[in-house]
Amino acid sequence: MENVILNCQNLYKHFGKKEILKGISFEICSGDILGFIGPNGSGKTTTIKLILGLQSIDNGSVEINGFNVVKNFEKAIEKVGAIVENPDLYMYLSGYDNLKLVANLYKGIDSKRIDEVIKLVGLENRINDKVSKYSLGMRQRLGLAQAILHKPNLLILDEPTNGLDPEGIKDLRELLVKLATAEHMGILISSHNLAELESFCTKVCIIKNGVIIESSEIDVVKSECSDSYYIFDVDDSKKAQPVSGGGLPPGGAKLVNVSQHAVSSLA
């Protein structure tokens, strides 16, 4: 039986009269890497903030390791690591000193664990350099090291590929796969670009205007769309289907109410 780490059920969130989330549900199990995909303003970051208790939930529930985030916040959040937006780093300190500061916030993190995490993220040769000398990709890896020091089983990353070059994205991809397998983590990674995530995610959820319009195993998406997968923005998907006729691209298409930000080749 799969070990469910994160369970989000029927989440709603309003800001004033604007409805941001409209009853979204999904779950993450141990070893899952879930790509949470959607254009800017779709509700990705709001969802993450609800999961982490940074914003209040209007309706619905979030459970982490069986603990309700609202009713038992400390227990729910104790095995969670997260980077929302950019890693929080002291640029004038070394990478090692940054990790020591975070380690002091928890009980039981010794130098052996710090060294273990440094090796895991591949910063052994630069860990004593000042962070100001790090590349963006190296800072991202140091941020990940901070997030996993206390051995969480859920890792949440909000748009971690922003600003990374192709080599940095490749390094991040390999590191996340290693964490999911070696550390048995469940990982939620948000992005507006499915193409950056589809090669290593095990699941995908596509969100638009606060609604999840596609949720499945990534292998299922690939098998259904053997050549390319296209998502078109239409006013009425039922009416558009017969009209599309032979104009559909090879490999199939899905006609839903979603921005073309989600269009991606899944060859």
Predicted regions and their residues:
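Conserved ABC transporter NBD signature motif
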Residues: 60-71, 75-76
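Conserved ABC ATPase "signature" region
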Residues: 100, 111-126
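Conserved catalytic motifs of ABC-family nucleotide-binding domains
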Residues: 151
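Catalytic Walker B motif of ABC-type/P-loop ATPase nucleotide-binding domains
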Residues: 155-159
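ABC transporter nucleotide-binding domain
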Residues: 173-263
